[in-house]
């Protein structure tokens, strides 16, 4: 594994020491460890070619999907799964053990103390955080700020890792990263080097990018995956009620993949979503809009944030749904340096 980059408080890049690298690697079991359990190296290579690079990721696949990999028979798949189970603990654990496991969650600062407080410390790893709202509500601006803050050291409320950005609308601007990096006292070129970017043009392309991402995350310490926006290409590639069922099925597969990436590699997944008209919202509701994606997206996102425009450059974030956060709102501001606390 190549040495990874880390920032000091002054923004200078440092090489992570061996102990820190070892901690990163302990987040998951490499698929190569199956060889020590008697699995043929050729079969391990077939798994890697199919986008499976960790034992954790392997156990997130059904045996039906694994037997679909060329060269893997049902008997081989059974043997591979048995070997993976020996390396992992996939059964029941106590609530106390789960609480200890939850201590591995990293919370990445949004750049605004008020917004961080609302979110319980920032954007969480191990889950999907969805932000939805109209255009200019701050969704993409928050994404740009997170690209930088995710690379801050842990003690500075960052994620100390790299960022993967999948852009479906062509709104990512590398020049926007420069002033945000300068605000945090970081080297802009180094920050940009730690962001891998891909422009997706179809929903299939978007899904294939996620499959290829596993190889990179298995080799280097990533802490954040951004998809901006998760629904745009599905709304283009599937039209009309006749294709709605297929669209939702494909969307569910995409979201399942995002969930697995979050849990497999301990990364935060931040997705943006569009809004649509809600004709059944009621006569007393003035803003008849709801997030796109229906129940499929609603159930997949762990934390749902509703963003709306405020006064001037101010934006308002409301907790729309979260398992561990109370309802509430926070006001923040979009500046040249990214997301900050609102100024009166």
Swiss-Prot record:
Write out the GO MF terms.
ATP binding; ATP-dependent activity, acting on DNA; ATP-dependent DNA damage sensor activity; DNA strand exchange activity; double-stranded DNA binding; single-stranded DNA binding; single-stranded DNA helicase activity
* Annotated localization: Nucleus
The entry's ssDNA-binding residues are: 235, 238, 241, 247, 315
Fetch the InterPro entries from UniProt: Dmc1, DNA_recomb/repair_Rad51_C, DNA_recomb/repair_RecA-like, DNA_repair_Rad51/TF_NusA_a-hlx, P-loop_NTPase, RecA_ATP-bd, RecA_monomer-monomer_interface
Residues annotated as coiled-coil are: none
Q: In which tissues is it expressed?
A: Expressed in meiotic young panicles.
| Cysteines engaged in disulfide bonds, as pairs | none
Q: Which UniProt keywords apply?
A: ATP-binding, Cell cycle, DNA-binding, Meiosis, Nucleotide-binding, Nucleus
User: Can you name a GO cellular component term?
Assistant: nucleus
Q: Name one GO biological process term.
A: DNA strand invasion
Where ATP is bound, by residue? Answer: 133-140
Q: Please give the SUPFAM superfamilies that the UniProt record associates with this protein.
A: P-loop containing nucleoside triphosphate hydrolases (SSF52540), Rad51 N-terminal domain-like (SSF47794)
Q: Where does dsDNA bind?
A: 235, 241, 247
CDD domains assigned to the protein according to its UniProt record, in alphabetical order: DMC1 (cd19514)
Role: Recombinase that may participate in meiotic recombination, specifically in homologous strand assimilation, which is required for the resolution of meiotic double-strand breaks. Exhibits DNA-dependent ATPase activity when bound to single-stranded DNA (ssDNA). Mediates renaturation of homologous complementary strands as well as assimilation of single strands into homologous supercoiled duplexes leading to D-loop formation. Binds circular single-stranded DNA (ssDNA) and circular double-stranded DNA (dsDNA) in vitro. Catalyzes DNA homologous renaturation and DNA strand exchange.
Q: Which family does it belong to?
A: Belongs to the RecA family. DMC1 subfamily.
| Additional detail | Plant silencing DMC1A are sterile due to defects in homologous pairing and subsequent chromosome segregation during male meiosis.
By what name is this protein known? Meiotic recombination protein DMC1 homolog A
Q: Which organism is it from?
A: Oryza sativa subsp. japonica
């Amino acid at each position: 594994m190549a040495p990874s980059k880390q920032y000091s408080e002054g923004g200078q890049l440092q090489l992570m020491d061996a102990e820190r690298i070892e901690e990163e690697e302990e987040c998951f079991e490499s698929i190569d460890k199956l060889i020590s359990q008697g699995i043929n190296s050729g079969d391990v290579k077939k798994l890697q070619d199919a986008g499976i690079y960790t034992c954790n990721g392997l156990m997130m696949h059904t045996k039906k999907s694994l037997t679909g990999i060329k060269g893997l028979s049902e008997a081989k798949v059974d043997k591979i799964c048995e070997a993976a189970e020996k390396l992992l603990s996939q059964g029941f654990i106590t609530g106390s053990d789960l609480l200890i496991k939850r201590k591995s969650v990293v919370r990445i600062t949004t750049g605004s103390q008020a917004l961080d407080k609302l979110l319980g410390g920032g954007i969480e790893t191990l889950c999907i955080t969805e932000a939805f709202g109209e255009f200019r509500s701050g969704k993409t601006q928050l994404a740009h700020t997170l690209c930088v803050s995710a690379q801050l050291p842990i003690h500075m409320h960052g994620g100390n890792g790299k960022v993967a950005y999948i852009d479906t609308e062509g709104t990512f601007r590398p020049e926007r990263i420069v002033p945000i990096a300068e605000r945090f006292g970081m080297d802009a070129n180094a920050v940009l080097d730690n962001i891998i970017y891909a422009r997706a043009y179809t929903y299939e392309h978007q899904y294939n990018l996620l499959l290829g991402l596993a190889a990179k995350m298995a080799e280097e310490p990533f802490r954040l995956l951004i998809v901006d926006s998760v629904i745009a290409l599905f709304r283009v590639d599937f039209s009309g009620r006749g294709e709605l069922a297929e669209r939702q099925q494909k969307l569910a597969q995409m979201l399942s993949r995002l969930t697995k990436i979050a849990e497999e590699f301990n990364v935060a997944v931040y997705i943006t979503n569009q809004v649509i008209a809600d004709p059944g919202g009621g006569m007393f509701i003035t803003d008849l809009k709801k997030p796109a994606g229906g129940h499929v997206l609603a159930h997949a996102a762990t934390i749902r944030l509703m963003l709306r425009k405020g006064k001037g450059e101010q934006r308002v974030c409301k907790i729309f749904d979260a398992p561990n956060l109370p309802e509430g709102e926070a006001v923040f501001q979009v500046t040249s340096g990214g997301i900050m606390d609102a100024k009166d």
